[in-house]
Every structure is written in structure tokens, then in C-alpha cells.
């Protein structure tokens, strides 16, 4: 069954968020994330942590279709590869880009033939092809970003992130910062790794409404019906600009795109709204990475970013291959283990009220200790 690891979990009316992780150790959603690379390879780093055996390790990464410089999960994954090479001088890394989904299998086979020590595939859509290759080549180590398997595969380090949690914090913050009483979110494609962010964001707004007796509305997503706004890809910035302009015209003053590079179109729309005389002030949140690093030209509009700890998770998968600690299995990044987090407020640090910051800390603690249960129809484990 296609994507069976997810489909099985998705049969439940509401899958309760999993707060535990297994497999190898990964942490820190606040790790710096790069904006991609100009070349398809990176030489071994000059870091201080040399591999004990001195054995050379080749780490190979395959992007999803958004490109290496998507300012999102591809760029973060490549930054993790480069961080591994910097940490261990015996590691070298390179990548292949997937222009379409038809490139997945040829790219995987190319790297298998090149005898890569670990092949890192990026994105939910690569789940089936990675599984097929891993089962056909049990001695080949893999890691995959944004997917997990049930049962876990011993030669695949499956890296998934419970972004319903920090999405919830983002929604709570957005509701608390909105002046119009309307906020909005949209996705690139309707995939579980996209809608889980949107579920969390939606629920965070509802929780704020409950606590403050407010009625802040969410445009672009309805968790109950699982219907909402999607641009259809992760690359078309014009679509992102258009859908954001529509939300702004409907009164939304905080926008949360879950759409990779499409989010740059949203940022352009926010920038244009800011320049329009007499218009309502509009701001936004970035996704996956700290937008003030990966899309710094729009930092003044980013209240925060709803992050995944992809950089550290990928780095650990590659360095674990080099030092012999690779375990395989499923890893779930959470608030508790540092795998997901809100980014710093940057330019908004003085604009977010102290009381709201305190509430966010309380909500974070509630999610971590289980007193706040987040339900999402997007599964977070295999």
C-alpha cells in the first residue's frame, strides 16, 4: 500500500501526538541552517572531531523537487551534510537534485553505484522509493527526512518531526499578536508533513481563543474537515504571492506559509502590503528554518519561525555512519528533545508582550509534560 506507514496511522479520526522518540540521538531545532550550496559536492571538513579509524566516509544527499536552495528542508538537510563534513575531516559529502519525482529512483541508484556510505533522501514523497531501495540493499545505510516506517527499517535512520507542537505555539502566538482577529495559513502540497504544521497552528489559535475568550479566525485551513488552501507545489512564488494577497484582502494580518520557496512570494505580498499607504500592518511566520537566516531580506516581517531540527538530525545520521554509532529506526523530533522549536523573535523581541512570552513558556511546558494534548489527523510516527 503506498505510503502505508502513514496511511495506517491516518485511519484514526484523530491521531494523538506522540511525545517519545526512538532510534539514534538527534537534537536542537535552533541549529543554524544554511541556504544551500552552489556546487554538488563539499570536501572533507577541517573540524576537530576526527574519526577514530581514519576511514573515509562518503555522505550523499538527494533533494526533493524544491531545489537545494529552497530555504526549507532541502537547504537545511544540505546544511546538516556540510556540518557533518566540518565536524569530521574524514567525511565528504555531495548531492543530486531532483527536478521531478521521476528523478528519485535514478538518483538513488546513482548513489548506490557510487558506493556512498550513507544516502540521505529528503521529503515525504521519497518515502516509498527509499524503502524499496533499502530493502533491496540491506547493507546500504540510508536516512530520510520527513518520513518514518512501520515497522522501522534497520538500515534507515528515519527523521520525522512533530511540528504540530511548535505549530501550536506559532498559532497561539499569531492569535495573541493579531490586531484584526484573522490569521491565515496555506500549504505547498497536501502532504502529512505539511498539514501537521497547519493542524498545530489551527489548534494553537483555538487554544488561545479558549484561554482569552476571543474569536480569532484561521483562514486557509480547517482542521476538522482537513480542507484548506494549497498552491500545488513548493516552488511557484507567484502563487504564494497571490494566495497571500487574497488572505490580506480578507483581513488576515499574520500569514504562515508551509510551502518552502513559495513562502518567498508570501513575503513579497506582505512587503507590498507594508508599503501601501494606509494599509493594515501585516506580518508573517516562516517555516522549517529560521527565516531571519534563510530569507534574511524579509526578517523585519517575521514574528518568528516554526522550526525543525533538520540540520542536527542529518548531521548526526552522517557522523553516526562515520563513527559506527548509526542505529537506524525512527526518530521523532519534539519540543522535549529539542527537535522542534520556535525561532527567536529577532526584530519582534520588543514587540511581543512580556505576558504573551510568559504564556508561550507555560504552553510549552504543558505540551512537554502532557497536560496539553495536541490532536492531529496528520500522523507523526510510523
Predicted segments, located by residue:
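Short, low-complexity intrinsically disordered segments enriched in small and basic residues
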Residues: 1, 29-30
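Bacterial N-terminal signal peptides that target proteins for export
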Residues: 1-10
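Hydrophobic helical h-region of N-terminal Sec-dependent signal peptides
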Residues: 11-16
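C-terminal motif of bacterial Sec signal peptides marking the signal peptidase cleavage site
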Residues: 17-21
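Bacterial signal peptide processing site
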Residues: 23-26
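A residue-level marker of the well-folded mature domains of exported/periplasmic proteins
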Residues: 31-382
Amino acid at each position: 500500500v503506498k505510503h502505508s506507514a502513514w496511511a495506517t496511522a491516518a485511519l484514526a479520526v484523530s491521531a494523538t501526538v506522540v511525545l517519545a522518540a526512538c532510534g539514534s540521538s538527534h537534537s536542537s531545532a535552533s541549529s543554524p541552517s544554511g541556504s544551500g550550496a552552489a556546487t554538488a559536492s563539499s570536501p572533507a571538513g577541517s573540524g576537530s572531531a576526527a574519526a577514530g579509524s581514519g576511514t573515509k566516509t562518503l555522505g550523499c544527499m538527494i533533494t526533493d523537487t524544491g531545489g537545494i536552495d529552497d530555504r526549507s528542508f532541502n537547504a537545511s538537510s544540505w546544511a546538516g551534510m556540510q556540518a557533518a563534513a566540518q565536524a569530521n575531516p574524514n567525511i565528504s559529502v555531495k548531492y543530486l537534485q531532483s527536478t521531478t519525482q521521476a528523478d528519485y529512483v535514478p538518483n538513488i541508484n546513482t548513489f548506490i553505484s557510487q558506493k556512498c556510505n550513507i544516502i540521505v533522501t529528503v521529503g515525504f514523497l521519497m518515502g516509498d522509493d527509499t524503502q524499496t531501495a533499502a530493502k533491496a540493499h540491506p547493507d546500504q545505510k540510508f536516512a530520510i527526512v520527513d518520513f518514518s516506517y512501520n515497522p522501522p527499517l534497520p538500515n534507515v535512520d528515519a527523521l520525522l518531526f512533530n511540528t504540530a507542537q511548535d505549530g501550536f505555539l506559532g498559532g497561539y502566538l499569531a492569535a495573541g499578536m493579531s490586531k484584526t482577529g484573522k490569521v491565515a495559513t496555506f500549504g505547498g502540497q497536501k502532504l502529512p508533513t505539511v498539514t501537521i504544521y497547519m493542524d498545530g497552528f489551527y489548534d494553537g489559535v483555538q487554544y488561545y481563543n479558549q484561554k482569552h475568550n476571543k474569536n480569532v479566525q484561521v483562514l486557509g485551513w480547517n482542521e476538522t474537515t482537513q480542507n484548506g488552501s494549497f498552491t500545488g507545489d513548493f516552488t511557484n512564488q507567484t502563487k504564494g504571492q497571490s494566495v497571500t494577497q487574497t488572505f490580506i484582502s480578507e483581513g488576515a494580518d499574520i500569514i504562515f506559509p508551509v510551502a518552502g520557496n513559495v513562502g518567498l512570494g508570501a513575503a513579497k505580498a506582505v512587503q507590498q502590503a507594508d508599503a501601501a499607504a494606509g494599509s493594515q500592518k501585516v506580518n508573517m511566520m516562516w517555516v522549517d528554518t529560521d527565516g531571519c537566516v534563510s530569507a534574511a531580506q524579509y526578517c523585519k516581517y517575521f514574528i518568528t519561525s516554526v522550526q525543525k531540527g533538520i540540520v542536527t538530525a542529518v548531521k548526526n545520521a552522517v557522523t553516526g555512519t562515520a563513527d559506527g554509532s548509526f542505529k537506524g529506526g525512527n526518530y521523532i523530533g519534539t519540543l522535549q528533545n529539542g527537535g522542534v522549536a520556535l525561532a527567536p523573535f529577532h526584530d519582534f523581541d520588543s514587540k511581543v508582550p512580556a505576558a504573551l512570552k510568559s504564556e508561550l513558556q507555560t504552553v510549552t511546558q504543558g505540551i512537554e509534560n502532557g497536560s496539553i494534548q495536541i490532536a492531529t489527523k496528520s500522523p507523526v510516527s510510523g
